[in-house]
């Protein structure tokens, strides 16, 4: 069993990193997991395109997990069946595709993984999108969700192995700015300040986020992902080692694919009228 973590896929726009040409899945099964750090983007309106890509993920030899970002269809997402999976609440999106709800702690392959989705859309998005259709106030966790997250962490004595969010806590601003100017679009805000209170108090091995469209370690124990895929160290290795390097960086980045990552869209799907049922501004 292996656990992989990667960044935003934005529906089909950036899903190519999970294709066979970019991601060697030899030997993987549905007992292996790929966690997407938000902006999953395949739950908006049940379009033919969305249904195709969800079926495509179901055919891949891994189980797909994701936290929500700010580019999600929250009306549909929140209406999906909720169940308990590996100790936490999830929405089941497809046979082997699960939304890891906010403020949950999952036991996956012996690792305790805390999830807290959500992020603020850019001013451009809030101005040019339609609230309740292509932009949702639910993108920011509400007070009840935050209270539930604190209760989850209280029950775990504020100790876990990994944290998965979409945006980063505010103290990561400098590290992000060294790699991108996207903070001009997505500045730190009240929610990232709240995440900072979590990071300051929590004992954890490593924190992963998406949102900023970079692949970089932005703080000693925080990594932002976009195109690259990280594989978590085997928990038995972590438990048995006293190697400081392994303990300080408990994951490895898979080799970067050569060439352009192009979405593996077959001809008949590319002809579907609503293939691009939502214009996503990646700038």
Language-model features, listed with the residues they occupy:
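Active-site-proximal loop/helix segment associated with metal-binding centers of metalloenzymes
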Residues: 95, 109-187
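Beta-strand-turn-beta hairpins that frame and shape the catalytic cleft
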Residues: 1-4, 104-115, 162, 219-223
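Conserved beta-sheet core of the metallophosphoesterase superfamily
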Residues: 63-67, 83-87, 91, 95, ...
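A short acidic (Asp/Glu
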Residues: 15-16, 45-48, 76-79, 167, ...
């Amino acid at each position: 069993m292996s656990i992989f973590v990667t960044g935003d896929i934005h529906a089909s726009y950036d899903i190519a990193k999970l294709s066979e040409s970019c991601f060697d899945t030899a030997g993987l099964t549905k007992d292996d997991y790929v966690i997407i750090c938000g902006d999953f983007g395949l739950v908006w309106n049940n379009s033919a395109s969305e249904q195709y890509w969800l079926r495509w993920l179901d055919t891949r030899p891994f189980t797909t997990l994701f936290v929500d970002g700010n580019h999600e269809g929250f009306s549909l997402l929140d209406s999906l069946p909720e169940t308990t999976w590996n100790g936490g609440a999830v929405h089941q999106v497809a046979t082997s595709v699960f939304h890891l709800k906010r403020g949950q702690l999952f036991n996956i392959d012996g690792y305790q993984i805390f999830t807290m989705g959500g992020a603020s859309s850019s001013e451009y998005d809030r101005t040019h999108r339609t609230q309740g259709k292509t932009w949702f106030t639910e993108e920011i966790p509400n007070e009840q969700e935050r209270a539930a997250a604190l209760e989850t962490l209280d029950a775990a004595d504020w100790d876990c192995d990994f944290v998965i969010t979409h945006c980063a806590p505010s103290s990561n601003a400098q590290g992000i700015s060294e790699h991108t100017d996207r903070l001009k679009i997505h500045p730190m805000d009240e929610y990232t300040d709240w995440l900072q209170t979590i990071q300051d108090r929590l004992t954890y091995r490593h924190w992963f986020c998406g949102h900023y469209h970079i692949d970089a370690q932005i703080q000693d124990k925080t990594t932002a992902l976009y195109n690259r895929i990280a594989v978590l160290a085997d928990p038995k290795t972590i438990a048995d080692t006293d190697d400081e390097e392994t303990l300080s960086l408990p994951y490895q980045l898979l080799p970067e694919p050569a060439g352009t990552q192009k979405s593996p869209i077959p001809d008949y799907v590319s002809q579907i009228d609503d293939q691009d049922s939502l214009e996503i501004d990646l700038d």
